[in-house]
Design a protein with these regions (language model features):
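Bacterial Sec-dependent N-terminal signal peptides
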Residues: 1-21
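Function-determining sites in protein domains
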Residues: 16-163
Length: 163
């Protein structure tokens, strides 16, 4: 038993723990623009034995229309869209960058596979956990705007079970 504890100690120490949402640190001002950095692929942790490469991540950047950015920002202020659990697996994350007066005010990282969600204001972590409900729906919709409702349901069935 004692050996098992010391064997698991490095994994416990390196694991990221959930952090409750700190609404006092969430940016409250006006937004100028919202950028989306959509990443797809796999990491060393999520690759499979016959994978052509150990790790492959592709990145596509686009600007989200301001109306959609404001709608997403309003959803972020809802206390019911956060789940204070952290997934065991780290996956490729896409980023949503919120700007005001040309400065980055809020950075949000989201994984479609695990619903992992981390939010930063500058370098300060303000939330680490998972998304749920309408936040998950909107994030997936903004990352995959060309998919129909049926395709979204088929591709993200596991994600939609709780919604």
């Amino acid at each position: 038993m004692f050996r098992l504890f010391f064997l698991l100690l490095p994994y416990i120490a390196l694991a990221q723990y959930p952090k409750a949402m700190d609404f006092s640190k969430l940016y409250q001002g006006k937004l100028d623009s919202v950028a989306v950095v959509h990443r797809t692929g796999w990491t060393k942790e999520t690759s499979w034995p016959e994978a052509p490469e150990e790790e492959r991540i592709t990145e596509k950047r686009k600007r989200l229309p301001l109306s959609k950015g404001k709608r997403l920002f309003k959803i972020l202020q809802d206390k019911t869209v956060y789940k204070e659990e952290y997934p065991l697996l780290n996956d490729v994350v896409s980023s949503f960058l919120f700007y005001a007066n040309g400065n980055e005010m809020l950075t949000m990282h989201f994984s479609t596979a695990t619903k992992q969600l981390t939010m930063y204001r500058g370098d300060e972590l303000i939330f680490a956990g998972m998304s749920k409900g309408k936040l998950t729906k909107k994030l997936i919709r903004y990352l995959y705007p060309k998919l129909s409702a049926k395709e979204l349901y088929m591709n993200f069935f596991i994600l939609w079970e709780e919604i």
